[in-house]
Regions:
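Conserved core of the PLP fold type I
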Residues: 3, 7-153
């Protein structure tokens, strides 16, 4: 006898990689995004952040694993999500604080930092309802964030 849910998933197992379809549907409705872009898992954002940093440390995001580099830095918009900061601290990643402007991080500062510091590999950002302020990044801020080097991570 198979135990199935509405979606014909065997619910006796661990579930799908992207999370429960019903949770993803709710997330899509709340965030006004397509379900295909929504992940729903245990404390998903924190889990994803930790997994990504671990992958970059051991596999890299460009030419070499980050753990082979002398210094790894990530830009941290402030005020920001304390879990971003805790992950960086735990993994020995240098945090560079950049103030929020009302449209996201001050991109003039970000661009200057990235241009002059090869150790910077990315930026923590939550462009929609940024924690803890609720700030929403402007289209210009998002576009400017996407222009950096191949090993830049957002």
């Amino acid at each position: 006898m198979e135990i199935l849910f509405k979606t014909a998933l065997d619910i006796r197992n661990y579930g799908e990689i992207k999370g429960l379809p019903s949770a993803r549907k709710l997330g899509a409705q709340l965030l006004d995004y397509s379900e295909e872009f929504i992940l729903a898992s245990s404390n998903s954002s924190l889990t994803l952040m930790g997994n990504l940093l671990s992958a970059f440390l051991f596999n890299g995001s460009g030419d070499s694993p980050w753990n082979e580099l002398e210094t790894i830095s990530i830009i941290c918009p402030v005020p920001g999500y304390d879990r971003h900061f805790a992950l960086c601290e735990k993994l020995g990643i240098k945090m560079i604080k950049v103030p929020l402007t009302g449209d996201g991080p001050d991109m003039n500062i970000v661009e200057d930092l990235v241009k002059n510091d090869d150790s910077i590999k990315g930026i923590w950002c939550n462009p929609k309802h940024s924690n803890p302020t609720g700030e929403i990044y402007s289209q210009d801020t998002v576009k400017r964030n996407c222009q950096f080097a191949i090993d830049w991570r957002i």
